[in-house]
Amino acid sequence: MIKKVLQLLIFHLTLAEIVLSGNVVVWPTDGSHWLNIKILLEELVQRNHSVTVLAPSETLFINSRLDAFINFEEIPVSYTKSKIDEIIEHMIALWLDHRPTPLTMWTFYKELGNLLATFYTTNKQMCDGVLNNPTVMERLQKGGFDVLLADPVTMCGELVALKLGIPFVYTLRFSPAFTVERHCGKIPAPISYVPAALSELTDQMSFGERVKNIISYSLQDYIFKTYWGEWNSYYSKVLGRPTTLCETMGKAEIWLMRTYWDFEFPRPYLPNFEFVGGLHCKPAKPLPKEMEEFVQTSGEHGIVVFSLGSMVKNLTDEKANLIASALAQIPQKVLWRYKGKIPDTLGSNTRLFDWIPQNDLLGHPKTRAFITHGGTNGIYEAIYHGIPMVGVPMFADQPDNIAHMKAKGAAVEVNMNTMTSSDLLNALRTVINEPSYKENAMRLSRIHHDQPVKPLDRAVFWIEFVMRHKGAKHLRVAAHDLSWFQYHSLDVIGFLLACVASAILLVAKCCLFIFQKVGKTGKKKKRD
């Protein structure tokens, strides 16, 4: 009996070793994307997996010295950190100056194309630094990796996986108009009720909005096929056979989508798409002593948390003074993450910080509102803790994210370009004083928390699943094996139309033949 128990114990320990000792290689994207995926990597390490990150020699947030729990393979690149900052500043300026409207849409997408061309150049350097570097590739080949975790915003992660002969998993929020998910992942997206990502539309669209939605999808498809299509020749060269970017991306085993139904509008998905939105969220921890003392001085009015994220460093003096003037007029105390010059209009109720523990502040019982730029990470922390928002979106997905929160009744938006002190003040008073905003924020929070598995656990499970089973091919839809005309059943429709046309033609011929026969018979009788 004891022998059997020991054998069973050894068997389970062996299984545990198989599950818990994976070797993961990571192809990341810098910026806020890294801040999100790092939480997932920390959890993988906690579960006894080895994690190696392929990081370029110049980055914004990926720091091998600070993240000692992770192994880093440095990729030599010739661009500098200032080049990355320049691209980000260009992106912010593009959205602020030409935020997509019917009048600015063409200019916006033209400039976006130029920006993508610049991004292509820097991204390609990272690709070459690995794929065309025999020394790095040899080390990776000897690494014994089980799976590659990639953010598809930065190209070539899938190429590294294929060259190493291992499966790969994606982690992403979305691509513009879901181009990658639709064309490469094959998810259906009925344009009648699925708003294109970045369109700032909801699933309740008027006729005019549906027209805008179709235009948004069409423009993003054009950009994807034109600018991102430049990768096709590169991918074909690396793999040594004709292929496309999309065909290669379509080989992803699992797509970990950093969203959930507390954030998204209902729409169809596929079985290899898993929702892990808010995986970085966690219960609030105690605040630093000095910060807690300031929070407690707010009394019954509570506090407002204000952050424009990690990518926006400074504002113009005029804009900073405008904001500070509005904040000075509310009874709440304000904790503002800001590194710029101290505004002349800064009120006694407002304190500036180079950095704030945002999640811990949003989880504080005295927090009444969150002024946010609309980044996904910050919005999910607000959802997690049930805090209503004032959105001041600036670029990329931020306007679209705030549009989602407005539609769900948990946010008010203020336009960064045109806002006045009164606009910001009125928006703050609205979300703080009107109970519906807090109620809707709490409703989203309850939806987020009421899941059978926590988002972080779900993400780890599917990465481990791919390692255990060497992939997840059983979840891959047959759409990947169809041509575009087969996918839309155009061949079948054409065949059926041909059959109908043939039948109509045959009936017409028969009728004509009968009429001719009847006519000849009638003429013959008359002659007789």
Swiss-Prot record:
UniProt-annotated glycosylation sites, renumbered to this chain: 48, 314
Keyword Acetylation applies: no
Chain ranges on the Cytoplasmic side, renumbered to this chain: 516-528
Cell location: Membrane
Transmembrane segments: 495-515
Pfam families in alphabetical order: UDPGT (PF00201)
UniProt key word DNA repair: no
EC main group: transferase
Coiled coil location: none
An annotated GO BP: xenobiotic metabolic process
Its membrane topology: Single-pass type I membrane protein
EC number: 2.4.1.17
InterPro entries for this protein: UDP-glycosyltransferase, UDP_glucos_trans, UDP_glycos_trans_CS
One of the record's GO molecular function terms: glucuronosyltransferase activity
Lineage top rank: taxon: Eukaryota
Reaction(s) this enzyme catalyzes, per UniProt: glucuronate acceptor + UDP-alpha-D-glucuronate = acceptor beta-D-glucuronoside + UDP + H(+); 17alpha-estradiol + UDP-alpha-D-glucuronate = 17alpha-estradiol 3-O-(beta-D-glucuronate) + UDP + H(+); 17beta-estradiol + UDP-alpha-D-glucuronate = 17beta-estradiol 3-O-(beta-D-glucuronate) + UDP + H(+); chenodeoxycholate + UDP-alpha-D-glucuronate = chenodeoxycholoyl-24-O-(beta-D-glucuronate) + UDP
Keyword tags: Glycoprotein, Glycosyltransferase, Lipid metabolism, Membrane, Signal, Transferase, Transmembrane, Transmembrane helix
Side Extracellular, residues: 22-494
Gene Ontology CC, one term: membrane
Signal peptide: 1-21
PANTHER family to which the protein is assigned, alphabetical: EG:EG0003.4 PROTEIN-RELATED, UDP-GLUCURONOSYLTRANSFERASE 2A2
Family: Belongs to the UDP-glycosyltransferase family.
Role, per record: UDP-glucuronosyltransferase (UGT) that catalyzes phase II biotransformation reactions in which lipophilic substrates are conjugated with glucuronic acid to increase the metabolite's water solubility, thereby facilitating excretion into either the urine or bile. Essential for the elimination and detoxification of drugs, xenobiotics and endogenous compounds. Catalyzes the glucuronidation of endogenous estrogen hormone estradiol. Contributes to bile acid (BA) detoxification by catalyzing the glucuronidation of BA substrates, which are natural detergents for dietary lipids absorption.
Additional record remark: UGT2A2 isoform is part of the UGT2A complex locus which displays alternative use of promoters and exons. The locus is defined by 2 alternative promoters resulting in 2 functionally active polypeptides UGT2A1 and UGT2A2. Alternative splicing of exons results in additional isoforms for each protein class.
Name of the protein this chain belongs to: UDP-glucuronosyltransferase 2A2
Phylogenetic lineage: Eukaryota, Metazoa, Chordata, Craniata, Vertebrata
